[in-house]
């Protein structure tokens, strides 16, 4: 390639990888500058300088010089190659911006206080070096370091530091992914204009060579930055694992102090922590060696595989410990010798199903007996008894049930009969109602018998009164006019005045018998009026103001229009009485 960027005829592309061609390429001004700025040179240390623009200034100057050559059209004669060179140089500008972002991200990570503290804490914690900066072996640290570590075990500084560094690694990884996608677009541009177009000779042009060298340099910086972030993550995880192991060890120590159990697990975990720290000490040294070497070295990859093995072993140990701890906790909870469990058991009532059923039966029987006793002790007349509906009885029963003791409620809640108790109470209520109806039926039966006796007495009284009236009429047949009808005396008088009216009649031999029977009739009627008028069918008879007696027999006898009489009573009257 001459100064104008054209390929000489005698230059063969297949000899690019040979020693002579590489020596010739080292003489190229573009390639030689990138080789001198390689990652193994001291120029890499200048990338950590605060002035990030100075790190890419030498690349920017090369791009500007190449742009002036393209604008002057002094090295290209083809219009297509001129357009490609301009596009290639624009890609170089974009790649320089990506490289500047990579350098800034390196600077932020290098100057971060958390990451600096992490590196120092890992070296001290795993005894790679002491706080004075001298490296010591694991055996030289002695018991003093162990006491120092034990004094700082309760400190959560390492835990917080590790978590913050892991979070910073996550953010940096997201930024690296974005930068990697931008660099991949540059690679696709190079591939599409050289290999895919079968124009590999374009790689020998100054603009394409500059873009290719910038891309290779950026990829090396990006790979090294990934190694740094991965190393920070590995150190954070190792420090966090050490903190969690020590936390578990302290937990076992406290558990052994409060409980007289075997401390075998505590001793095993203490030995595990010692061996872990001794192993991590060697591992950290190898990790630092791999980071200081070439990014393409396989030593760093081997360190990553070792770290993955360590992490998987810790996860297995942690999971196994959690399972054992959970099992031991369940055994302690189920153990009858536990004090807290005994206290809890003593607070709970011991349930005996047989005694519980007896208590429930006696409880329901007491409710029924109290209800029956209330009905027996409280005098209720016929009208009040009729007005007491089934809904009111249910409300009374509900109030009685709500007044039961809390111990009974607790017992019913803890038994299997809880679901059946409402149906049992309903059955007892129905039984009580049936018993009341049977009692009412018995009362009506007694009333029927008394009514039959009354009817027989009334028929006897009727016969006697008829004979008396006949004798009176026959004895007073000499009067000019007959006496007024007897019914007129009953229209304006009450049944209670019948005795005085009948006392005005002339005396006869049967007057004493009539008077006694009249008194018996009044007593029977008074008893009848005071009794309940509800039959077996529950028909309610409301007394109304009417003229005459409540008996069709007397109304027929004295010629008075009868009042309302129950159907049950009418059905029992003989048809011969309605004369």
UniProtKB/Swiss-Prot annotation:
Residues 1-27, 378-401, 446-518 are annotated as: Disordered. One of its GO terms (biological process) is mitochondrial fission. Residues 446-463 have a biased composition (Basic and acidic residues). The gene is MDM36. The modification Phosphoserine is found at residue 42. Present with 414 molecules/cell in log phase SD medium. Involved in mitochondrial distribution and morphology. Disulfide bonds: none annotated. Keywords: Phosphoprotein. Residues 379-390 have a biased composition (Polar residues). This is Mitochondrial distribution and morphology protein 36.
């Amino acid at each position: 390639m001459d100064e104008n960027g054209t390929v000489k005829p005698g230059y063969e592309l297949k000899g690019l990888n040979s020693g002579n061609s590489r020596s010739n390429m080292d003489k190229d001004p573009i390639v030689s500058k990138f080789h001198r700025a390689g990652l193994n040179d001291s120029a890499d240390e200048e990338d950590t300088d605060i002035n990030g623009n100075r790190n890419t200034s030498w690349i920017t100057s090369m791009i500007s010089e190449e742009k002036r050559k393209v604008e002057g059209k002094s090295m290209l004669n083809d219009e297509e190659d001129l357009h490609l060179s301009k596009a290639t140089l624009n890609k170089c500008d974009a790649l320089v911006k990506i490289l500047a972002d990579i350098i800034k991200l390196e600077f932020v990570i290098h100057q971060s206080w958390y990451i600096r503290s992490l590196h120092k804490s890992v070296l001290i914690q795993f005894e790679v070096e002491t706080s004075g900066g001298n490296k010591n072996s694991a055996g030289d640290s002695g018991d003093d370091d162990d006491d120092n570590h034990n004094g700082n075990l309760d400190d959560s500084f390492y835990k917080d530091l590790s978590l913050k560094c892991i979070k910073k690694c996550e953010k940096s990884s997201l930024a690296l992914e974005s930068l990697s996608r931008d660099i991949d677009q540059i690679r696709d541009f190079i591939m599409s204009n050289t290999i895919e177009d079968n124009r590999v000779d374009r790689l020998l042009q100054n603009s394409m060579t500059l873009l290719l060298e910038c891309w290779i340099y950026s990829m090396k910086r990006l790979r090294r930055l990934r190694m740094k972030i991965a190393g920070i993550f590995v150190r954070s995880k190792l420090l966090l694992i050490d903190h969690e192991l020590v936390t578990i060890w302290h937990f076992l120590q406290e558990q052994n102090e409060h409980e007289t159990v075997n401390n075998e697990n505590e001793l095993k975990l203490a030995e595990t922590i010692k061996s872990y720290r001794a192993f991590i000490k060697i591992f950290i040294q190898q990790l630092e060696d791999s980071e200081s070497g070439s990014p393409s070295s396989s030593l760093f990859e081997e360190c990553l595989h070792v770290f993955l093995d360590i992490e998987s072993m810790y996860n297995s140990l942690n999971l196994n410990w959690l399972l054992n701890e959970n099992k031991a906790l369940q055994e302690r909870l189920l153990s009858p010798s536990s004090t807290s469990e005994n206290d809890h058991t003593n607070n709970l009532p011991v349930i005996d199903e047989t005694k519980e059923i007896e208590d429930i039966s006696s409880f329901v029987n007491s409710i029924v007996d109290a209800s029956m006793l209330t009905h027996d002790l409280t005098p209720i007349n016929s009208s009040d008894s009729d007005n007491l509906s089934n809904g009111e009885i249910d409300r009374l029963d509900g109030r009685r049930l709500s007044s039961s003791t809390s111990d009974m409620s607790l017992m019913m809640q803890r038994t299997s009969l809880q679901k059946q108790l409402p149906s049992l109470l309903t059955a007892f209520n129905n039984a009580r109602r049936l018993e009341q109806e049977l009692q009412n039926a018995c009362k009506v039966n007694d009333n029927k018998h008394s009514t039959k006796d009354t009817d027989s007495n009334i028929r006897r009284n009727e016969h006697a009164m008829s004979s008396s009236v006949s004798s009176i009429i026959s004895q007073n047949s000499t009067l000019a006019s007959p006496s007024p009808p007897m019914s007129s005396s009953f229209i304006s008088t009450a049944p209670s005045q019948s005795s005085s009216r009948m006392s005005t009649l002339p005396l006869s031999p049967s007057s004493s018998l009539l008077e006694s029977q009249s008194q018996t009739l009044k007593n029977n009627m008074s008893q009848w009026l005071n009794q309940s008028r509800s039959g077996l069918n529950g028909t309610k008879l409301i007394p109304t103001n009417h003229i005459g007696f409540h008996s069709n027999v007397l109304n027929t006898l004295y010629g008075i229009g009868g009042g309302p009489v129950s159907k049950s009573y009418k059905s029992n009257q003989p048809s011969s009485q309605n004369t």
